[in-house]
C-alpha cells in the first residue's frame, strides 16, 4: 500500500507548499499530472468549500487514492470582499497576476491603511477512498500593500501585507509562510481530521 495523496492542482508552487506542510505525515503528495490524471473542472460553486469539493470529486472519480483539493481566494473588505471565490478568474484566467495585482492596487488608490484590510481564505476538501468527504477552512488576516513586494510567493502574495511580520507573504521565508498561511492552517486542520481515518488511502 502506498501512502499517497493526489492533490487536485497543476500549480507547482502550491504542490511544493503542500508537500512541505504534509512532510511529517509520511504521505507522498502527488499533483494530478504526476498521478497521470488530466481533467478540466468547471468550478461553479458558491463557496470555497463547494469549489474544493467539485475539484476533489472529479479527481476521485479517476483514482482509488485519497484525493485532496483546495479553493482559495483574496477578500478585500473595501471592495466588498472582491475578488473572493473568483480570485483565480479575476480579470480572466489568462491574465497575469502582475496585472491583477496592479489593478487591485489601482482600485485602492487613496484608501488609507486602516481601510485596506483583507484576508486570504482557504478551504480544503478531502475525499477518502470509501467516498467520505471532509472539509476544513482557515484564513490569514492582513491588508493590501501599495506595491508588489517579494519573490517567494505566487498569485496575490506580493500585495498581501502581514502586519505580524511587517512584510508581504511573498517576502516571507517558506517556514514563516507555513506558520501563518491560510493553506497551511487549513492543511493542519485537515491533517488532524485525517488521523481519524489512518489506513484509508491507496
Feature-to-residue mapping (PLM):
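Anionic-ligand binding patches
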Residues: 2-6, 12-202
Amino acid at each position: 500500500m502506498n501512502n499517497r495523496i493526489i492533490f487536485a492542482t497543476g500549480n507547482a508552487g502550491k504542490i511544493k507548499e503542500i508537500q512541505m506542510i504534509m512532510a511529517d505525515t509520511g504521505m507522498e503528495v502527488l499533483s494530478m499530472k504526476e498521478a497521470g490524471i488530466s481533467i478540466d473542472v468547471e468550478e461553479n460553486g458558491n463557496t470555497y468549500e463547494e469549489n474544493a469539493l467539485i475539484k476533489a470529486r472529479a479527481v476521485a472519480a479517476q483514482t482509488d487514492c485519497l484525493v485532496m483539493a483546495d479553493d482559495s481566494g483574496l477578500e478585500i473588505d473595501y471592495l466588498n470582499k472582491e475578488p473572493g471565490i473568483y480570485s483565480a478568474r479575476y480579470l480572466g484566467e489568462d491574465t497575469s497576476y502582475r496585472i491583477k495585482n496592479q489593478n487591485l492596487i489601482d482600485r485602492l488608490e487613496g484608501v488609507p491603511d486602516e481601510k485596506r484590510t483583507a484576508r486570504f481564505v482557504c478551504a480544503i476538501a478531502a475525499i477518502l477512498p470509501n467516498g467520505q468527504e471532509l472539509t476544513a477552512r482557515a484564513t490569514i488576516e492582513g491588508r493590501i500593500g501599495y506595491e508588489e513586494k517579494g519573490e517567494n510567493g505566487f498569485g496575490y502574495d506580493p500585495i498581501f501585507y502581514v502586519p505580524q511580520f511587517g512584510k508581504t507573504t511573498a517576502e516571507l521565508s517558506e517556514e514563516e509562510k507555513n506558520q501563518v498561511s491560510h493553506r497551511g492552517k487549513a492543511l493542519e486542520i485537515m491533517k488532524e481530521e485525517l488521523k481519524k481515518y489512518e489506513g484509508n488511502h491507496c
